[in-house]
Amino acid sequence: FTCLAGPMSFVLLLFAEHAMAKEPVCGRVLCGGRGVPGVVVTDGERFTQTDSHGAYRLVCGENAMHVYISVPAGYTVPVAESAPMFWIRVDTLAVREGIDFTLLREPDKGRRHRFVAMGDPQVRNRRELSQLDSLLAALKRTVAQLPASSEIPVLVAGDIVFNRPKMHLPSKKSFAVLGRPVFYAIGNHDHGPIRDSETPANEEPATRRFREHYGPTYYSFNRGRVH
């Protein structure tokens, strides 16, 4: 009996931790204080949809870092330092209190839409950041000339920085000058140092810095009839 006490306690402890990890996350998806039905909510592995009142309940996987939504057509989301806030980290206090997501209505439901796509800013230092700033200022002037029928998001197709994780925050702040949502995709140079991204086993630590700044590495959103 004495010999089994330690292992049994250890097993019970593991069971308790496992049970805590499986605690469901609950909340609502709201627009103007009203629940939005049918919105997909996920942790990247498991999915659910909001009910007729905009409420959801999701049991997250043990390795989940975010809970996030697939922004439905006809809506956009608030922006923080250029990053669309369709996600929240699961290690925040808000998880225990419930995670609510805010949607903003598009004027024309996004049926007529444009977007700007760019790739490989690959910022390494402050000098290159200033070059990016000049490009973004020109881009802002160009976008301002387009008809303002709906929100015009920007898509950055990877390699935001060039193997310099410390440049993610200043780069994200630079993109904020555009005053519109910037959807980021991860590129090979956005991982940790090159040596840390050569094997699948290093994928999680190599992408963690990106996910801390921009949210999940894969996600979706809807514009008009396009997913």
Q: What spans do the regions from the language model cover?
A:
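Bacterial N-terminal signal peptides
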Residues: 2-14
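Beta-strand-rich domain onsets/edges
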Residues: 13-24
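Short, ordered, surface-exposed loop/turn motifs in non-cytosolic proteins
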Residues: 22-45, 62-63
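N-terminal active-site segment of His-dependent metallophosphoesterases
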Residues: 24, 81-168
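Conserved catalytic scaffold of divalent metal-dependent phosphoesterases
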Residues: 31, 86, 99-108, 121-124, ...
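Short, acidic Ser/Thr/Gly-rich low-complexity loop/linker segments typical of extracellular
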Residues: 42-60
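A short, solvent-exposed loop/turn motif at the edges and junctions
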Residues: 43, 64-89
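Extended active-site neighborhood of metal-dependent phosphoesterases/phosphodiesterases
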Residues: 73-79, 166-227
